[in-house]
């Protein structure tokens, strides 16, 4: 009886799953981020680890924006490119790169991020963990951030892999 129930559930799952088709709409909607892990042939441990993403309403317009963590050049890296974390502003389902305007284009080897209103001013702040110095961005409430890492004592010069606000 148990075996026939499991087979029945699995067949329903396959029948239902056949109707789903996923299309990559990221380019059409303006999300053009591609993560680069450093790409050396040295097989550094850090190259095997992915990076974080934050869903953050940084501009208080009641829709979620996206902050992507990016890799960074490692020793013996032969690419001639500048990598930085990216912030994409959600504008009714169309995404605009707001990294430069917001001032959150950290160029360290970022691993993770967390967002929360740390200073209770109604604006969501952003913490980025890095292979190297972590960064804390205070949201200024006008679409921009200020790096206040030193002022708040965010002193982790080694390797921060993840973070969370409670």
Question: Predicted regions span which residues?
Answer:
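Acidic, glycine/proline-rich Ca2+-coordinating loop motifs
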Residues: 16-166
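Bacterial N-terminal signal peptides
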Residues: 4-15
């Amino acid at each position: 009886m148990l075996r026939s129930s499991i087979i029945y559930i699995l067949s329903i799952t396959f029948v239902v799953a056949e109707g789903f088709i996923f299309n990559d709409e990221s380019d059409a909607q303006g999300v053009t981020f591609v993560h680069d892990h450093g790409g050396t042939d040295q097989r550094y441990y850090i190259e095997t680890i992915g990076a974080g993403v934050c869903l953050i309403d940084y501009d208080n317009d009641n829709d979620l924006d996206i902050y992507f963590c990016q890799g960074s050049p490692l020793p013996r890296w032969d690419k001639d490119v500048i990598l930085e974390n990216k912030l994409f502003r959600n504008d009714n389902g169309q995404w605009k790169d707001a990294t430069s305007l917001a001032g959150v284009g950290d160029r360290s080897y970022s691993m993770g991020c967390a967002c929360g209103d740390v200073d209770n001013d109604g604006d969501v702040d952003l913490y980025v963990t890095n292979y190297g110095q972590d960064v804390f961005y205070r949201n200024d409430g006008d679409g921009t951030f200020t790096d206040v890492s030193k002022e708040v004592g965010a002193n982790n010069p080694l390797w921060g892999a993840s973070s969370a606000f409670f």
